From Swiss-Prot:
Gene3D superfamilies in alphabetical order: P-loop containing nucleotide triphosphate hydrolases, Putative DNA-binding domain, N-terminal subdomain of bacterial translation initiation factor IF2, Translation factors, Translation initiation factor IF- 2, domain 3
Name the UniProt record assigns to this protein: Translation initiation factor IF-2
Species for this entry: Shigella boydii serotype 18 (strain CDC 3083-94 / BS512)
Region (G5): 534-536
Gene of this entry: infB
Start-end of Polar residues biased regions: 67-81
Subcellular location(s) of the protein: Cytoplasm
UniProt KW keywords: Acetylation, Cytoplasm, GTP-binding, Initiation factor, Nucleotide-binding, Protein biosynthesis
Length: 890
């Protein structure tokens, strides 16, 4: 091969002349651009380039893994996402010379570390020895100085004590020397311990590095030739091997993985925290550092029960009580069962029960008053100071039709009784009358048995009770009830013996009958005034008013006239044009138009006030009855009326009262349900009469509801589905249609929209104006639901004279009818010696071989008894029939 120049060779290799000259220079050959190159020089350059570019053997592996991930989406649907993981790994085979060089470097590093460890040990030993010597010298100096001070102080003492002091000094010196020696020994032990710890630490580090080197040395000859590591770093190799184990773990979780997994039943298995710590140690933390311990928070069960302060309101659920005591709800339920109370976790229990349960479980109970807001509102009132005399509030009570309203009518000189349906009073009327001797406020209560609660309210709101008794009728049931209400309210009674102008009047009989109930006239040594009156003729009215005023003067009735008013609701109703209307009797203070009132569950601002004559008034003082407008709803009769300052607080108190009433009602219902559980399980099918009741005033609704509910029996129950004040609306009709109920209107009518629903649904709508008729018709409806009573009536007796055998019917009794008539296919009884021995049915009845339907008294016949052949001569066959008797509600 001929020689070529550098330029030609550069053109052939497609490189620059300068680069080629530099490559020749690196190979140890000096050339210029115009020099020629021999074949030997070319080979030298090629060998140099090959040696320079040669590297370790490499092997690159690529892997793809595909999986599907379900991602939850909106609407409960899941979405599948395809995931592909790509991994690439390169394994490098090192040159043996390179491995030797690395081993030499590591050996040198180990020797250097060992030398450093030895030097550190020697240095620490020297430092500890020097420190111990210094401390001993300092201790000796301090002791010598202290000894010199003590010797100088002791020179002035008596000579006979010097010997003792010398001995003590020698003993003290010996003790100090012993302490110094002990201190030196402890210092040497401390230094030795530190040296041992340092040596152990260095040895542990050396052992760990040796294990790493061993792992590196053993990896190449023992592993498969394809399992190469990319780097020589120990930590990188650990991370790489860990990733390999994670990838292969899914496939290799077979027998080995199951065998390595600890069994559940193994009592000696390590705890979860130990397993987590070991797992963390195997993985290694960031940078290859091992975690010392698990970061999970540990919790240990308290060694003893924790007693807590449990705050309990008026009502609380079982679950809330359990949370306050930090126990499970099941434990509270168990504690209640031990106390004899059944409960569920969501049941509302009262304060007393919750207190018993909490104290039984060892906790301290703090009872919380939930009516603090109500008390604050009630206390923030300007009630004035000076009390002035006020008019008496007189309630007229007595039996129905004894002339109460007629008596009051004569006093007021108006015709009130004619306006009452049926001539009986059906709600409380409140009136005040001006007389020559002062003003009197009258409350007229119903006398019918249904209005018990009204009479009770009238007695509670009154100062004096006028008991009206008809002279011709005497004491009646409602008269006795009125006496009981008056005694319960502790108010004096003035007896008005009415209808004294009738010929059959007997006032002495009235006195005798009333004396049996503790009402004694003054002439008999009692405290009650008896006045003979006639509401029709007007006799004795002035004497009655004088007796009332005299009794009021004895009572010394006083009230605060100035300030914020308070009173009671006598009656309430819903007016179609004016909304909720309440008749209020003011007890204290003065009620003004525009005042903010709180009335039971309702509140509002007084928009208008009217007296009993329908006249607008701006204010009402004590003992004055007025109608007020502007409440948020119809209050219950008997509720307290209070004037407050803030309408917002009044609303909060009203809403609180509603919620409290609902909670207490639910708790009471739940308790009764659980207590009557077994009784309800045993009772059979009960018919129900559903009623939707609407009336003109609240008192009538209450009285009618009570009367109807009292009609319920074990077989027929009266259920008031809905009740209210005002006309019958479309909502009431819809409710009645849904519950299959009877619509009852008492002094009210249905509006146009309600009538359409009633016609479309064919509902049973009934109007009443007298409570007698309403109760009687509901009784009739309930009677129709009663199952009839079955009664057995004997219609004939036949005496057996002889017995014949029949191939078709068996034994045939030849009988003589002694009483009544014997009918075919009627039930019979066979009596022997007046004892019933068989009860069955008469199957065959013949007379002279002819089948007949009946045989009358005094005739002979043949009787075949169904499924009975033991008929004997002398037996008596009793024929009877079953009749149904319709029962009625008493």
């Amino acid at each position: 091969m001929t020689d070529v120049t550098i330029k030609t060779l550069a053109a052939e290799r497609q490189t620059s002349v300068e680069r080629l000259v530099q490559q020749f220079a690196d190979a140890g050959i000096r050339k210029s651009a115009d020099d020629s190159v021999s074949a030997k020089e070319k080979q030298t350059l090629i060998d140099h380039l090959n040696q320079k570019n040669s590297g370790p053997d490499k092997l690159t592996l690529q892997r793809k893994t595909r999986s599907t991930l379900n991602i939850p989406g909106t609407g409960g649907k899941s979405k599948s996402v395809q995931i592909e993981v790509r991994k690439k790994r390169t394994f490098v085979k090192r040159d043996p010379q390179e491995a030797e060089r690395l081993a030499a470097e590591e050996q040198a590093q180990r020797e250097a570390e060992e030398q450093a460890r030895r030097e550190a040990e020697e240095s620490a030993k020297r430092e500890a020895q020097q420190k111990a010597e210094r401390e001993a010298a300092e201790q000796a100096k301090r002791e010598a100085a202290e000894q010199a001070k003590r010797e100088a102080a002791e020179k002035d003492k008596v000579s006979n004590q010097q010997d003792d002091m010398t001995k003590n000094a020698q003993a003290e010196k010996a003790r100090r020397e012993q302490e110094a020696a002990e201190l030196k020994r402890k210092a040497e032990e401390e230094a030795r311990r530190k040296l041992e710890e340092e040596a152990r630490r260095v040895a542990e580090e050396a052992r760990r590095m040796a294990e790493e080197n061993k792992w590196t040395d053993n990896a190449e000859p023992t592993e498969d030739s394809s399992d190469y590591h990319v780097t020589t770093s120990q930590h990188a190799r650990q991370a790489e091997d860990e990733s390999d184990r994670e990838v292969e773990g899914g496939r290799g979780r077979g027998r080995n993985a199951k065998a390595a997994r600890p069994k559940k039943g193994n009592k000696h298995a390590e705890s979860k925290a130990d397993r987590e710590e070991a797992r963390a140690a195997v993985r290694g933390g960031k940078g290859g550092k091992r975690k010392g311990s698990s970061l999970q928070q540990g919790f240990q069960k308290p060694a003893q029960a924790v007693n807590r302060d449990v705050v309990i309101g008026e009502t609380i659920t079982v679950g809330e009580l359990a949370n306050k005591m930090a126990v499970k709800g099941s434990q509270v339920i168990k504690a209640m069962m031990k106390l004899g109370a059944m409960a569920t976790i969501n049941q509302v229990i009262d304060q007393e029960t919750a207190q018993l349960v909490a104290e039984e479980m060892g906790h301290k109970v703090i009872l919380r008053r939930e009516n603090e807001l109500e008390e604050a509102v009630m206390s923030d009132r300007d009630t004035g100071a000076a009390a002035e005399p006020r008019a008496p509030v007189v309630t007229i009570m007595g039996h129905v039709d004894h002339g109460k309203t007629s008596l009051l009518d004569y006093i007021r000189s108006t015709k009130v009784a004619s306006g009452e349906a049926g001539g009986i009073t059906q709600h409380i009327g409140a009136y005040h009358v001006e007389t020559e001797n002062g003003m009197i406020t009258f409350l007229d209560t119903p006398g019918h048995a249904a209005f018990t609660s009204m009479r009770a309210r009238g007695a509670q709101a009154t100062d004096i009770v006028v008991l009206v008794v008809a002279a011709d009728d005497g004491v009646m049931p409602q008269t006795i009830e009125a006496i009981q209400h008056a005694k319960a309210a502790q108010v004096p009674v003035v007896v008005a013996v009415n209808k004294i102008d009738k010929p059959e009047a007997d006032p002495d009989r009235v006195k005798n009958e009333l004396s049996q109930y503790g009402i004694l006239p003054e002439e008999w040594g009692g405290e009650s005034q008896f006045v003979h009156v006639s509401a029709k003729a007007g006799t004795g009215i002035d004497e009655l008013l004088d007796a009332i005023l005299l009794q009021a003067e004895v009572l010394e009735l006083k009230a605060v006239r100035k300030g914020m008013a308070s009173g009671a609701v006598i009656e309430s109703f819903l007016d179609k044009g004016r909304g909720p209307v309440a008749t209020v009797l003011v007890r204290e203070g003065t009620l003004h138009k525009g005042d903010i009132v709180l009335c039971g569950f309702e509140y509002g601002r007084v928009r208008a006030m009217r007296n009993e004559l329908g006249q607008e008034v701006l204010e009402a003082g004590p003992s004055i009855p007025v109608e007020i407008l502007g409440l948020s709803g119809v209050p219950a009769a008997g509720d307290e009326v209070t004037v407050v300052r803030d309408e917002k607080k009044a609303r909060e108190v009203a809403l609180y009262r509603q919620g409290k009433f609902r909670e207490v009602k639910l708790a009471r219902q739940q308790k009764s349900k659980l207590e009557n559980m077994f009784a309800n399980m045993t009772e059979g099918e009960v018919h129900e009469v559903n009623i939707v009741l609407k009336a003109d005033v609240q008192g009538s609704v209450e009285a009618i509801s009570d009367s109807l509910l009292k009609l319920s029996t074990d077989e027929v129950k009266v259920k008031i589905i809905g009740s209210g004040v005002g006309g019958i609306t479309e909502t009431d009709a819809t409710l009645a249609a849904a519950s299959n109920a009877i619509l009852v209107g008492f002094n009210v009518r249905a509006d146009a929209s309600a009538r359409k629903v009633i016609e479309a649904e064919s509902l049973d709508l009934r109007y009443y104006s007298v409570i007698y008729n309403l109760i009687d018709e509901v009784k009739a409806a309930m009677s129709g639901m009663l199952s009839p009573e079955l009664k057995q009536q004997i219609i004939g007796l036949a005496e057996v004279r002889d017995v014949f055998k029949s191939p078709k019917f068996g034994a045939i009794a030849g009988c003589m009818v002694t009483e009544g008539v014997v009918k075919r296919h009627n039930p019979i009884r066979v009596l022997r010696d007046n004892v019933v021995i068989y009860e069955g049915e008469l199957e065959s009845l013949r007379r002279f071989k002819d089948d007949v339907n009946e045989v009358r008294n005094g005739m002979e016949c043949g009787i075949g008894v169904k499924n009975y052949n033991d008929v004997r001569t002398g037996d008596v066959i009793e024929v009877f029939e079953i009749i149904e008797i319709q029962r009625t509600i008493a």
